[in-house]
């Protein structure tokens, strides 16, 4: 639940994602931000200076990626101990919104407290996936696959051994998104626990 993925954008700026025990709240680099809850994303210059809090309110996202427009996508974890309880919050795919709270409020891993998706001041997930352990995230920026997959988000579940895919639009602000599709999974007794995905 600490610091996880690191990526660069097209301008060479460095982004860092961390879970709800990454201790972003109260960190010397982020002392100008008050009320940080859960995990978040920080952006630095290419020289690792001038940190900016992009967003917060995550439980434990491992990875993230940018689409062709520079929008960030991440896959956040659930609190598996609360599965089937009324307040359970499933794993979920987000299109990250700048300076926004994405719902998760507590540190630690033993219990959860996520704002409901209908709260006006929380970002609603693009897709609520269900039980799982989110790991790698990649936006497909290539031409080998059919156009249907261009700019689609691929994201991995370690627990159930699946790679999900959610197609997006090149004009993704306000676009409609379908449910997750299983792109890849193991069969029979073959083990498959994806931890990362790259292109």
Language model: regions and residue ranges:
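Beta-propeller domains with acidic blade repeats across secreted/periplasmic ectodomains
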Residues: 1-199
């Amino acid at each position: 639940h600490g610091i996880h993925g690191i990526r660069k954008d097209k301008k060479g700026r460095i982004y860092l994602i961390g879970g709800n025990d990454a201790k972003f709240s109260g960190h010397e680099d982020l002392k100008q931000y008050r009320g940080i809850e859960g995990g978040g994303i920080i952006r630095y210059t290419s020289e690792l200076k001038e940190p900016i809090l992009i967003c917060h309110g995550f439980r434990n996202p491992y990875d993230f990626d940018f689409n062709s427009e520079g929008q960030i996508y991440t896959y956040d974890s659930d609190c598996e101990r609360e599965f089937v309880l009324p307040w359970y919050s499933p794993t979920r795919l987000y299109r990250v919104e700048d300076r926004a709270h994405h719902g998760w409020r507590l540190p630690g891993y033993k219990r959860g407290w996520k704002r409901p998706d209908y709260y006006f001041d929380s970002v609603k997930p693009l897709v609520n996936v269900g039980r799982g352990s989110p790991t790698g995230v990649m936006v497909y920026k290539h031409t080998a696959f059919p156009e249907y997959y261009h700019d689609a988000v691929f994201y991995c579940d370690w627990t159930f051994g699946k790679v999900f895919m959610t197609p997006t639009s090149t004009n993704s602000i306000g676009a409609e998104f379908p449910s997750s599709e299983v792109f890849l999974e193991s069969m029979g007794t073959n083990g498959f626990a994806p931890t990362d995905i790259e292109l």
